[in-house]
């Protein structure tokens, strides 16, 4: 077999090693056993090869004639390669062995394999494209769809091809992987938005179409929830100097997202409908009725699928995608600014997920569960019946410990089912080693996943709540067993997901049962022999040099030699000269040799051949599975939802949360801040909240640091927790469903957009006023602090009156006590304040402020609490005294409505003139003539200001 293996790859005798080679096979006789096995007749193997090639080339790629594969066949008589010693090191190494050169145009580095591959590849594809993209690193390229677009020369895009990698670090479940196509109607249809999105980790397409206003708030919020990797728009919307307002707003709000423009003709609603009819699985075909007349989302779907097929270099198998329509009315809207203010996903200190609402609730065990939790937090439910069903599940999980721990045990063993499906339903346009390895790996993962269906069903058998019973019913689908049986006729029973790159490599090599392909069995025996030879060679080197050498393996280096010793006593210079690529880590040396590098090359060639033949068998198997694969979408949905509900129940066990009710009133008894509870050593102070339609605006006053902002965030977080189906931190809680949640809390300047604090306030308030309605929850913190007192009071007063008129539930914190008089004009206004206490500080002989963080009725009785806070700080006492005197004088002036005297105006005019002269003397870089003109204008301005200051008539120039 060894001779046949080398002959197929056109190896020459130059591959022979330094020791006397076998005259027949050209390899070193590392062991008499392996040497004897290489005497297999070339004639018989050659005949087998011709038969295999004829069989493969006569069958279409995805519709092969079925090969009878009876169950119960065992592995080939040749044992799997021994991995003892090679398992010691699974870490990746920075250095890598040179890969063998592949034949020109060959996908598998083998002319023979390439010929078989070309003969078998007959699946029609929709678009032509370049060679397959690498699955790990992004490439910059120009797409054919965007040809002719002058402002776009390329983009970078990341496309995952495998569900999991046992040889690399795990990718975050929330790494951007969504591509979105957006199109807007023209003419009278302007404002009608069509969207289509697909997650490259999940084979699901979401379609949306809705009417938006001129602020495009719904579009921006929807994109924020999707967190896209790339956005596709028509090139007519992005013309330089004449781009649409929608394109401008999207680019301003998503600066770090890649944009691709494609020709308008690809936004074709007829083609979009054809795509959906071709790709949508039967169980979700009702979407056709929903979108038949929604032309803009169909157009977006056409452009999206055409583009994804190109960048993925693959097409989706017919009837393999879950396609669904989601309207904008099915979930609550939380804009991106509010999500940031409330710290829903990332905190405002280090921008990580800890100390956020997501961090409080995230005890999920799967990537799908984590993604579902994230999307639910950003888009809470508005349907009370659905929320109540979730709450029933959480309640049963809390009451039944056996169910809780049983589900947790089973769910934690599931892999990322959505990403697994995404890879399985894609058909590569060009077969590569990566594509073959990915399909084999994910078929093993699919087997692992299906084997967990029965344990999950057993755990749910005795559940009583409707939702859990529904999930149990979905698991009784006979197709799970049917798919698993088909897989087991081809895949070994002991082929399973394992940690460690060498473990997983072995699983892939021996995934297919023996006797299904005789040529595959021969190739695997060859691989076994090569691995045994490597182990034997290293054992001989250890004996030859009397060193404690052992075989190790990493994904980057392949097999290499490792030695644990006292590196101080034995330097690298003292190692034998044939050891090369020496690296030292602590008390361990890692190195290889020229012979071992050649053996690794042969091992890789053997793997390529095994992967290719296994891939062809897997493709035949997948063609039989595709018609039943629809049930896996239900399984994916079941697992992710159960994982999220378990996470809610887990969070409840760590704190005294209560089940919320849903009425027309927002009533919270002794509620507290969930994030603050997690990061504080002590339990936060609890407060009551009561808002109804007859009292829908709360004006909240109190000193700085008394807890006003924290209280506002607490209310919003509790509202979101209730609407996603979680228990809430309170003794009792009743909520009115909020269709939108708006906040205006941040007061930082926006340097990037050159916005001051006040301008940012006005933009955020304008956004709220344009989009709020009677189903909104609005939280406004200290509006008007960015301008002078009079204007701040006026703006705050007007905003409050508008919010009073639309009946939105509003909490408004302020330092402007004048707003508290609104309750005299409007019966639906309530005044609240945070209490503080004054404690005598004996050491400094001053009063200290004690913050109670308790909310009480009425307006605050504290006066000049800013001065008291300054006095309690390290500010010098002389400055505090001056400030108090000045405050007293200013207050008196305001009360008496006094105007400044002419003498003060004269002094101010002189002061302004002197200041400008000093600035000109210090900093001016003007030319003499321009400086002379500037000083002349300054003199004229002073001459005009001074007479007005002293009450004299102005002089006019002749």
UniProtKB/Swiss-Prot annotation:
UniProt-listed InterPro entries: DNA_mismatch_repair_MutS_C (IPR000432), DNA_mismatch_repair_MutS_clamp (IPR007861), DNA_mismatch_repair_MutS_core (IPR007696), DNA_mismatch_repair_MutS_sf (IPR036187), DNA_mmatch_repair_MutS_con_dom (IPR007860), MutS (IPR045076), MutS_con_dom_sf (IPR036678), P-loop_NTPase (IPR027417)
Skewed-composition ranges (Polar residues): 124-138, 146-161
Pfam families: MutS_II, MutS_III, MutS_IV, MutS_V
Residue positions binding ATP: 702-709
SMART domains: MUTSac, MUTSd
Tissue: Predominantly expressed in testis.
Residues in the signal sequence: none
Compositional bias segments (type: Low complexity): 91-107
GO MF annotation terms: ATP binding; ATP-dependent DNA damage sensor activity; mismatched DNA binding
Subcellular location, principal: nucleus
Known partners and oligomeric status: Heterooligomer of MSH4 and MSH5.
Summary of the function given for this chain in its UniProt record: Involved in meiotic recombination. Required for reciprocal recombination and proper segregation of homologous chromosomes at meiosis.
Protein name in UniProt: MutS protein homolog 4
């Amino acid at each position: 077999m060894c001779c046949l293996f080398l002959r197929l790859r056109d190896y020459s005798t130059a591959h022979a090693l330094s020791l006397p080679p076998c005259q027949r096979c050209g390899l070193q006789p590392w062991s008499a056993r392996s040497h004897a096995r290489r005497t297999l007749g070339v004639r018989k193997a050659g005949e087998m090869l011709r038969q295999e090639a004829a069989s493969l080339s006569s069958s279409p790629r995805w519709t092969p004639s079925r090969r009878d594969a009876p169950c119960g066949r065992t592995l080939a008589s040749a044992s799997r390669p021994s991995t003892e010693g090679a398992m010691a090191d699974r870490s990746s190494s920075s250095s890598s062995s040179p890969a063998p050169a592949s034949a020109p145009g060959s996908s598998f580095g083998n002319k023979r394999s390439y010929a078989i591959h070309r003969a078998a590849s007959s699946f029609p594809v929709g678009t032509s494209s370049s060679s397959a993209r690498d699955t790990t690193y992004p490439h910059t390229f120009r797409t054919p769809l965007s040809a002719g677009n002058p402002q776009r020369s390329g983009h970078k895009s990341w496309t995952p091809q495998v569900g999991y990698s046992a040889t690399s670090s795990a990718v975050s479940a929330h790494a951007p992987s969504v591509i979105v196509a957006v199109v807007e109607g023209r003419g009278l249809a302007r404002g009608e938005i069509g969207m289509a999105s697909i997650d490259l980790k999940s084979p699901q397409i979401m379609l949306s179409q809705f009417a938006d206003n001129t602020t495009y708030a719904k579009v921006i919020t929807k994109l924020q929830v999707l967190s896209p990797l790339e956005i596709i728009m028509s090139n007519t919307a992005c013309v330089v100097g004449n781009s649409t307002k929608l394109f401008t707003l999207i680019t301003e709000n998503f600066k770090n997202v890649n944009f691709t423009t494609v020709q308008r003709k690809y936004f074709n609603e007829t083609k979009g409908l054809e795509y959906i009819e071709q790709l949508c699985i039967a169980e979700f075909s009702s979407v056709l009725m929903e979108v038949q007349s929604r032309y803009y989302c169909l157009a977006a779907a056409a452009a999206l699928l055409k583009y994804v097929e190109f960048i993925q270099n693959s097409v989706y198998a017919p009837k393999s995608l879950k396609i669904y329509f989601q309207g904008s009315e099915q979930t609550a809207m939380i804009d991106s600014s509010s999500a940031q203010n409330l710290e829903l996903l990332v905190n405002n200190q280090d921008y990580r997920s800890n100390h956020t609402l997501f961090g409080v609730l995230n005890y999920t065990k799967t990537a799908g569960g984590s993604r579902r939790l994230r999307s639910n937090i950003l888009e809470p439910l508005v349907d009370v019946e659905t929320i109540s069903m979730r709450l029933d599940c959480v309640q049963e999980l809390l009451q039944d410990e056996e169910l809780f721990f049983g589900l947790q045990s089973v769910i934690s063993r599931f892999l990322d089912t959505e990403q697994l499906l995404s890879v399985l339903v894609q058909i590569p346009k060009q077969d590569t080693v990566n594509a073959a390895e990915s399909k084999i790996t994910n078929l093993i993962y699919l087997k692992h996943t299906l084997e967990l269906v029965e344990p999950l069903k057993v755990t749910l058998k005795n559940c009583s709540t409707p939702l859990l019973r529904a999930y149990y019913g979905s698991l009784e689908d006979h197709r799970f067993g049917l798919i698993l049986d088909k897989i087991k006729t081809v895949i070994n029973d002991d082929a399973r997901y394992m940690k460690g790159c060498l473990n997983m490599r072995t699983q892939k090599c021996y995934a297919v049962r023996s006797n299904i392909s005789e040529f595959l069995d021969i190739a695997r025996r060859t691989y076994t022999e090569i691995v045994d030879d490597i182990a034997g060679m290293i054992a001989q080197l250890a004996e030859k040099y009397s060193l404690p050498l052992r075989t190790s393996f990493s994904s980057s280096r392949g097999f290499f030699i490792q030695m644990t010793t006292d590196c101080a006593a034995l330097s690298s210079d003292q190692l034998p000269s044939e050891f090369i690529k020496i690296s030292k880590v602590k008390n361990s040396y890692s190195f290889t040799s020229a012979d071992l590098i050649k053996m690794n090359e042969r091992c890789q060639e053997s793997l390529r051949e095994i992967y290719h033949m296994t891939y062809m068998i897997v493709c035949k198997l997948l063609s039989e599975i595709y018609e039943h694969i629809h049930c896996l979408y239900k399984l994916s949905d079941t697992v992710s939802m159960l994982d999220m509900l378990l996470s809610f129940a887990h969070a409840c066990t760590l704190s005294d949360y209560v089940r919320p009710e849903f009425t027309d009133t927002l009533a919270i008894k002794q509620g507290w801040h969930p994030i603050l509870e997690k990061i504080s050593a002590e339990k936060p102070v609890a407060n009551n909240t009561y808002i109804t339609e007859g009292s829908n605006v709360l004006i909240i006053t109190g000193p700085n640091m008394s807890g006003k902002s924290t209280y506002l965030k607490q209310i919003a977080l509790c509202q979101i927790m209730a609407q996603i189906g979680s228990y809430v931190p309170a003794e009792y809680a009743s909520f009115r469903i909020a269709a939108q949640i708006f906040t205006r809390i941040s007061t930082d300047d926006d340097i990037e957009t050159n916005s001051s604090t006040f301008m940012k306030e006005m933009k955020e308030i304008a956004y709220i006023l344009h989009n709020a309605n009677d189903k909104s929850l609005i939280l406004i913190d200290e509006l008007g602090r960015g301008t002078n007192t009079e204007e701040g009071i006026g703006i705050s007063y007007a905003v409050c009156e508008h919010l009073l008129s639309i009946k939105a539930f509003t909490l408004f914190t302020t330092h402007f006590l004048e707003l508290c008089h609104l309750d005299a004009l409007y019966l639906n206004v309530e005044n609240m304040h945070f209490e503080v206490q004054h404690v005598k500080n004996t050491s400094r002989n001053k009063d200290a402020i004690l913050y109670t963080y308790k909310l009480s009725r009425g307006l605050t009785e504290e006066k000049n609490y800013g001065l008291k806070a300054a006095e309690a700080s390290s500010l010098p006492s002389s400055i505090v005294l001056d400030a108090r005197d000045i405050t007293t004088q200013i207050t008196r002036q305001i009360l008496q409505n006094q105007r400044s005297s002419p003498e003060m105006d004269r002094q101010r005019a002189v002061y302004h003139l002197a200041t400008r002269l000093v600035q000109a003397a210090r900093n001016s870089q003007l030319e003499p003539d321009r400086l002379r003109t500037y000083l002349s204008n300054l003199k004229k301005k002073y001459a005009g200001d001074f007479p007005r200051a002293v009450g004299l008539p102005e002089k006019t120039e002749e």
